[in-house]
Swiss-Prot record:
One of its GO terms (cellular component) is small ribosomal subunit. This is Small ribosomal subunit protein uS4. One of the primary rRNA binding proteins, it binds directly to 16S rRNA where it nucleates assembly of the body of the 30S subunit. With S5 and S12 plays an important role in translational accuracy. It comes from Acidobacterium capsulatum (strain ATCC 51196 / DSM 11244 / BCRC 80197 / JCM 7670 / NBRC 15755 / NCIMB 13165 / 161). SMART domains: Ribosomal_S4 (SM01390), S4 (SM00363). Disulfide bonds: none annotated. Residues 99-161 form the S4 RNA-binding domain. One of its GO terms (molecular function) is rRNA binding. Keywords: Ribonucleoprotein, Ribosomal protein, RNA-binding, rRNA-binding. Signal peptide: none annotated. Part of the 30S ribosomal subunit. Contacts protein S5. The interaction surface between S4 and S5 is involved in control of translational fidelity. Belongs to the universal ribosomal protein uS4 family. The keyword Cell cycle does not apply. GO terms for biological process: ribosomal small subunit biogenesis; translation.
Length: 209
């Protein structure tokens, strides 16, 4: 399966809700959901059938994959690892997704969206514990310190992210220093700490068949 490179607003329209994939644009009347709140495609307006059973489980999985920009193989690996670990499988799945470096860069306000955060990680603008890490899926651990590299602090995308995040409350499991573009993981995220429009239990049911 190739990575999706088309317009991300179509993904929100397909799921019928805002997935906040384009940062600040999602909070304006320019958002595609505000203009065309129906599925993309020739017959998008006519899709009125109620989704149940497998279809509902599939939609929840697709939402999670699209929010975190993961492919099917990688997403299934997260599930397999969560299912083998002690604890609630769905919560452990979300925990792994939240601890991705690109997601944490987004949560810390280094970018206005996960997509932007993924780019700044890939381009080597983020370091973990003083070392450059350019792997978006890198799993950050409790105690790790994440920051924007000194030479990258003036990037327009980073400054936009800082301005956007300065008015937002920081996640309870992260310690954020907006002035120095840095942060620290102080604990693993609990499900109640993660504002995510996904029913992870339906994903577990889908994969456990």
């Amino acid at each position: 399966m190739a990575r999706y490179t088309g317009p991300v607003c179509r993904l929100c329209r397909r799921e019928g809700m805002k997935l906040f994939l384009k940062g600040t644009k999602c909070f304006t009347d320019k958002c595609a959901i505000e203009k065309r709140n129906f599925a993309p495609g020739q017959h998008g307006r006519d899709r009125k059938a109620k989704i149940v059973g497998y279809g509902l489980q599939l939609r929840e999985k697709q939402k999670a994959k699209r929010i975190y920009f993961t492919l099917e193989g990688q997403f299934r690996e997260y599930y397999e690892k969560a299912s083998r670990a002690p604890g609630v499988t769905g919560e452990l799945l979300i925990q792994q997704l939240e601890c991705r470096l690109d997601n944490i860069a987004f949560r810390l306000g280094f970018a206005t969206s996960r997509r932007q955060a993924r780019q700044i990680v890939r381009h080597g603008h983020v370091e973990v514990n003083g070392r450059k890490v350019n792997i978006p899926s890198f799993q950050v651990k409790v105690g790790d310190e994440i920051k924007i590299r000194p030479n990258s602090s003036k990037l327009v995308v980073v400054e936009m992210g800082r301005d956007f995040a300065s008015g937002q409350p920081a996640p309870a499991w992260l310690q954020v220093d907006h002035a120095n573009l840095s942060g620290k993981v102080v604990s693993l995220p609990k499900r109640e700490d993660v504002n995510l429009p996904v029913n992870e239990q339906l994903i577990v049911e889908l994969y456990s068949k």
